[in-house]
Every structure is written in structure tokens, then in C-alpha cells.
């Protein structure tokens, strides 16, 4: 799984719990989008989280 270029977000781990409270391991994937941004003055395609895009931390090219 990819990692956010800006925030470093990646998938997180935890348990799903059944009605009987049995634990099963699962993952939650971050909402990552592949976008083109300027890195050192050159356009580059990177994975960026939706939160970083919405908050304006990154500017698309």
C-alpha cells in the first residue's frame, strides 16, 4: 500500500469485533489519490491523502 507524500498516512491496523466479541484482524486504508505536484520545481506523480488535498497543503500541477 502507498503512503501519503505530505502527511505520511498509510494503512492502519485493528480488529473487527463480531456480536460475540471475537476479534479478527483487519486494515483500514487511507484515502489516497495519485496526483501530479511540483517537487523541486519538476512535476511528479505522488500519492497524496484526500485530507492534504482538501486542506490546501499541496497544489496540483
Swiss-Prot record:
Transmembrane segments: none
GO MF terms, alphabetically ordered: structural constituent of ribosome
Biological process according to GO: translation
SUPFAM superfamilies tied to this protein: L28p-like
InterPro entries linked to this entry: Bacterial_rp_bL28 (IPR050096), Ribosomal_bL28 (IPR026569), Ribosomal_bL28/bL31-like_sf (IPR034704), Ribosomal_bL28_bact-type (IPR001383), Ribosomal_bL28_sf (IPR037147)
Keywords tagged on the record: Ribonucleoprotein, Ribosomal protein
Keyword NAD: no
GO cellular component: ribonucleoprotein complex; ribosome
Keyword Ribonucleoprotein: yes
PANTHER family to which the protein is assigned, alphabetical: 50S RIBOSOMAL PROTEIN L28 (PTHR39080), LARGE RIBOSOMAL SUBUNIT PROTEIN BL28A (PTHR39080:SF1)
NCBIfam families membership: L28
Recorded family membership: Belongs to the bacterial ribosomal protein bL28 family.
Official protein name in the record: Large ribosomal subunit protein bL28
